[in-house]
Amino acid sequence: MNKVLISVILAGFGAQLAKLIIYWFKHKSLSLHDIFVTGGMPSSHSAFVVSLTTIIYLTEGATALFSLSLVFAMVVVRDAYGVRRTAGNEGKALKKLFKAHHLKSKDHYAMGHTPKQVIIGSIIGFIVAFGVYFLL
């Protein structure tokens, strides 16, 4: 049984499912498009990589693979919060500018995450990894 793969899949899909449920309660509607929208609570990117790093540590210990996954997680989490959030804010500004000048723009722009969304996603990843490790 591949606990690493199970943990990562459960954390990623679990966070994405939580995001859909939160969206549905907030907007009282849901579409297929909403499954693939980036940004929002919680960060599935953070859940995914924190789960990966945690389960590797639990199964392998402090190995080179763990170190690699830790660096990978730091890059992904930083990207989810920093780079993608900045790009999302710029997308918002461009959309307003296009609207003011009656220009066409795409309906969705990729949003990054707030610190709270990243922390909650990370907690989900951590809990899922521990659950998979100790229950399977």
Question: Where are the model-predicted features located?
Answer:
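Membrane-embedded catalytic cores of phosphoryl/pyrophosphoryl-handling enzymes
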Residues: 13-20, 32-136
